């Protein structure tokens, strides 16, 4: 049963040749002769001719073995789960979400040596303040929910090559899982709907996007809209049954890179307040020896994020974190800045203090 929606699903096991396969299917699909034929695409031999018999067979099997079939808790996203913990760090929790996100769900894991990752993180932190900021922002992503803060962007940009922007993004992603571009790190080459769904899937984990220039039109203008992700709420969309789909929501940090700023002279004040734009130049590289550093975090990743979350669940920690956040927010708000900018800066500083 999905602990977010309460929807029940069944795991079906079937054999193709000598190989057993498993698939998790919604009971809504298994109750409709029109929908159940979609399982043919997964390799199950169901057709429009035998659909009714197949549905009856599955129903009978479930009813006859109801007390023998184990019930598992499932989830289709990352992040905080009320009364349960933080996905995917909940024991016994299985993924039952969109099949397109299954591969990404599996990227959030530990691999290699925690000691080597810590050594690499300590080394890159000494290379530039920019690395400290984006690394801290990666941790800060999971603070937004308990602190009731809004999503915000940290964007590294620069026209010079070899500044280490992408490697810095990979270091930030390695806090949680496989930092390879195409694994946990995605690119701007996608649709608005796709980005909304990915943001909702990540939920409280950082959304890492590389290469802003991929989101430009034929005239070289950036088509990416900061507001689409910074609001933390997707569009309400209708469905075929005449109702509306569940409105996607998220509360995380969006970490990005590109050759140009994420905001410009034409951007509204609201967009500017939601983005921390950091220019990167080759004369002052964000990360030196990028090939070696990227290789190190590709081999060793996924340790720090879990430990950071586990610390937040310790008794009294959230209260202490909230008090420190309010203190930092007051200090920053007294300066020449807006509340949204102070909020983003306070969470980054706080995350850096907690992670060190």
Language model segments and positions:
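Conserved glycine-centered beta->alpha loop in an early N-terminal alpha/beta scaffold
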Residues: 1-126, 197-198, 202
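P-loop NTPase catalytic core of nucleic-acid-dependent motor ATPases
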Residues: 93-181
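Contiguous, well-ordered alpha-helical segments that form the cores/surfaces of helical PPI scaffolds
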Residues: 131-146, 154-155, 166-174, 193-199, ...
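AAA+/P-loop NTPase substrate/partner-engagement loops
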Residues: 167-220
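AAA+/SF3 P-loop NTPase mechanochemical coupling elements
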Residues: 200-202, 239-256, 271
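A short beta-strand-to-loop transition that corresponds to the Sensor-1 phosphate-sensing loop
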Residues: 211, 251-261, 279-282
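Conserved catalytic/switch belt of AAA+ P-loop NTPases
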Residues: 223-237
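Phosphate-sensing "switch" segment of ASCE/P-loop ATPases
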Residues: 248-250, 266-356
